Amino acid sequence: MRKNRLGNFPSMALDVTVDNAMVFYLGGTYNEVGKPNENYGRELLELFTTGIGWYTEGDVKEAARVLTGWKASRFNDQPAPKGIYNTWFDANKHDTGAKEFLGVTIPARTVDNNTEFQVLNEEVFELIKIIFRVRPDAAARFIARKAYLYFVYSSKGDVDESFVNDLAAEFRAANFDIKPMLK
C-alpha cells in the first residue's frame, strides 16, 4: 500500500487484492474453483471502491470466481512456493470459465493461458479496471468521501457534499490518481 499511497488508486487496489495479508485475512486462500469465497470480492466493492448499491450479488460471486486460486502461505507447514508470507497462484484451483462482472465479460481461459502472470493481468487487474470503467462516478465519489472524512472532517453527519463532489471530480479527472485529489 505504501508504494501507491499517493499514486493510482486502481494500481493500489490491485496490489492490495493480491497482497499476502489480504488474501490470508479475508479467506482468499480458501477461494477455489467450485467453492468460491466471496469475502474479498464483497469488500473490494463495498468497502474499498464503490460502496453499497453499485453492484449486485451476482457481481460479488463473479468477483470471487476471478479471485480463485490465489493462496497465501503463513506458516512453515503450508505450501509456500515463494516462501512464507508471499502470495502465490495455484492454477488448478482457479476457475477458468468466463465471468460476467458489472455487465462486462471476462473471457474463459484455457490451461495454456492459466498462468499467474496472465490471470493477474487479464482477470484480476481487469476486474479492478472494470470497476473504475463501469462505475467511475460511484468509485470517485466513494473514495473522495472517505478522503474527506479522514483528512477534513470525521463526522458523517456534517459532510460538505459540494466539497466531496469537487474532490471526486478532481480524482476522476486525474484518472484516479490520489495525489491531485488531496492537493
Show where each model-derived region lies.
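Active-site substrate-binding loop specific to GH73 endo-beta-N-acetylglucosaminidase modules
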Residues: M1-K183
